[in-house]
Amino acid sequence: LPSLSADAEAPSPLSLKADAPLAHIDSGLLGVPYAKQPIGELRVTTLRLIELPPEKLVVGAPVYLYQFSYESPSSAIKQEVVGHIEDLTYVFKGSQYQDIESPTAYQSK
């Protein structure tokens, strides 16, 4: 990525490569680098990205935004809401399928 000066317009995060360092990606919406945004600010940024006109977005695979209205009884990440890693486990329950081998099962072969 080219270096950005303080007065330069930041590139859209949707047009950057997936392997770009987070510290160099600016939201372009709130004017705060992702690495420095509190969790609540990231949510606002996500909602604002959804509202961008189609010509501002890069064409690609569909992206879905989920908001869950429950609190995890055993949250290791947050106390009041559920962290993203936990929603993958508790809501989608991807670990309940028997056909999926764990990394440790693969190592024991």
UniProtKB/Swiss-Prot annotation:
UniProt keyword Hydrolase, yes or no: yes
Q: Which family does it belong to?
A: Belongs to the type-B carboxylesterase/lipase family.
Outline what the protein does: JH esterase plays a crucial role in the decrease of JH activity in lepidopteran insects, by hydrolyzing the methyl ester of JH. It is also involved in the transport of JH.
GO MF term set: juvenile-hormone esterase activity
Q: Which UniProt keywords apply?
A: Hydrolase, Serine esterase
Known catalytic reactions: juvenile hormone I + H2O = juvenile hormone I carboxylate + methanol + H(+); juvenile hormone III + H2O = juvenile hormone III carboxylate + methanol + H(+)
Spell out where the chain crosses the membrane: none
Q: In which tissues is it expressed?
A: Fat body, the site of their biosynthesis, and the hemolymph where it is secreted.
What's its top-level EC category? hydrolase
State what protein this is by name.
Juvenile hormone esterase, isoform A
Annotated EC? 3.1.1.59
